[in-house]
């Protein structure tokens, strides 16, 4: 039987770069929150040990796709620990709604959903901590999606502290460009020395994103999108872009602004969620097993 699993988007409500390690990775402080909008992963268990991706992505080999990599990672970890069932395998499809290179965490969210869903469907019995550790090998943002709760992240994004920021309404806009993360992080003008602050201090300050100045300088459409949004509400870049978002207290206020969006700017309205749709789904599945 085909099962459906949410793969939600995330926003970085703030993002500050606090340094750069000897290995090149940047240290940061960021606040992750989920929204009630994203991709949908479809999974039908198989009995023959095969992993099939039903919806390949253009220009990405199936074996390089994060969905397939996540499934194979779980197979290997389960086999190594004696938790792999005798009959396993899966047909996996994805209905994409999140843009690639948009800063919404689409690929990381897909990987996390596959780890969580297959662990449940195959009965592997990995804990959330174990799945998060596996997920970190796929990408720095995967653990927060596995854990499924809004979080303050430090280090290179792997040190997570659960938090509960206000669940506002957001107008999230895609300016029609894709920004590879290295383009931003390799820019020599990227701020890399923002002072480390406590979460208590950060929550009292106006939120910002150190990557925004670079994205606006290098991508004209990102600059134009933010300039337009800032006329209506507090707005900023999410992640390294390219998506930008504005925050509102009500859904109707967000939708009124979306209706006025220029033709070249595509967007949607979503509610902030401190417990992700994936976490809600797995809790419901566990409760009614």
UniProtKB/Swiss-Prot annotation:
Instruction: Write one Pfam family the protein is assigned to.
Output: GHMP_kinases_N
Ordered alphabetically, the record's keywords are:
ATP-binding, Isoprene biosynthesis, Kinase, Nucleotide-binding, Transferase
List the active-site residues: 10, 141
Would the keyword Disulfide bond turn up in this protein's UniProt record? no
Q: What is its EC number?
A: 2.7.1.148
GO MF terms listed in the record are: 4-(cytidine 5'-diphospho)-2-C-methyl-D-erythritol kinase activity; ATP binding
Q: Record-annotated residues binding ATP?
A: 99-109
> Catalytic activity annotated for this protein?
4-CDP-2-C-methyl-D-erythritol + ATP = 4-CDP-2-C-methyl-D-erythritol 2-phosphate + ADP + H(+)
This protein's record includes keyword Kinase: yes
- Give the residue spans that cross the bilayer: none
Its UniProt pathway annotation is:
Isoprenoid biosynthesis; isopentenyl diphosphate biosynthesis via DXP pathway; isopentenyl diphosphate from 1-deoxy-D-xylulose 5-phosphate: step 3/6
A biological process term (GO) from this entry: terpenoid biosynthetic process
Family of the protein in this entry: Belongs to the GHMP kinase family. IspE subfamily.
Functionally, this protein is described as follows: Catalyzes the phosphorylation of the position 2 hydroxy group of 4-diphosphocytidyl-2C-methyl-D-erythritol.
Q: Which PANTHER family match?
A: 4-DIPHOSPHOCYTIDYL-2-C-METHYL-D-ERYTHRITOL KINASE, CHLOROPLASTIC
Subunit composition?
Homodimer.
State what protein this is by name.
4-diphosphocytidyl-2-C-methyl-D-erythritol kinase
Origin organism is: Enterobacter sp. (strain 638)
The record's gene field reads: ispE
């Amino acid at each position: 039987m085909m099962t459906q699993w949410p793969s939600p988007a995330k926003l970085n409500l703030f993002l500050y770069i606090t340094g750069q390690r000897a290995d090149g990775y940047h240290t940061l402080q960021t606040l992750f929150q989920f929204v009630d909008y994203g991709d949908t992963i479809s999974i039908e268990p198989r009995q023959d040990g095969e992993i099939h991706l039903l919806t390949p992505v253009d220009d990405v080999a199936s074996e390089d796709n994060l969905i397939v990599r996540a499934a194979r990672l779980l197979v290997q970890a389960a086999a190594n620990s004696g938790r792999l069932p005798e009959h396993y395998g899966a047909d996996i499809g994805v209905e994409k709604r999140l843009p690639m290179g948009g800063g919404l965490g689409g690929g990381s969210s897909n990987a996390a959903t596959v780890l969580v869903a297959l662990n449940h469907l195959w009965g592997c019995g990995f804990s959330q901590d174990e799945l998060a550790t596996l997920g970190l090998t796929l990408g720095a943002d995967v653990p927060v999606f596995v854990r499924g709760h809004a979080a303050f992240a430090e280090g290179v994004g792997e040190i997570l502290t659960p938090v509960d920021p206000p669940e506002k309404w957001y107008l999230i806009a895609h300016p029609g460009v894709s920004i590879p993360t290295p383009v931003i992080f390799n820019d020599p003008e990227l701020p890399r020395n923002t002072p480390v602050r406590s979460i208590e201090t950060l929550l009292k300050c106006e939120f910002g994103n150190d990557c925004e100045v670079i994205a606006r300088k290098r991508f004209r459409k990102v600059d134009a999108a933010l300039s337009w949004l800032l006329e209506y509400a507090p707005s900023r870049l999410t992640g390294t872009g390219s998506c930008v978002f504005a925050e509102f207290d009500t859904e109707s206020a967000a939708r009124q602004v979306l209706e006025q969006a220029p033709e070249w700017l595509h967007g949607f309205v979503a509610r902030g969620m401190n417990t992700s749709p994936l976490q809600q789904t797995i809790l419901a599945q566990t409760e009614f097993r």
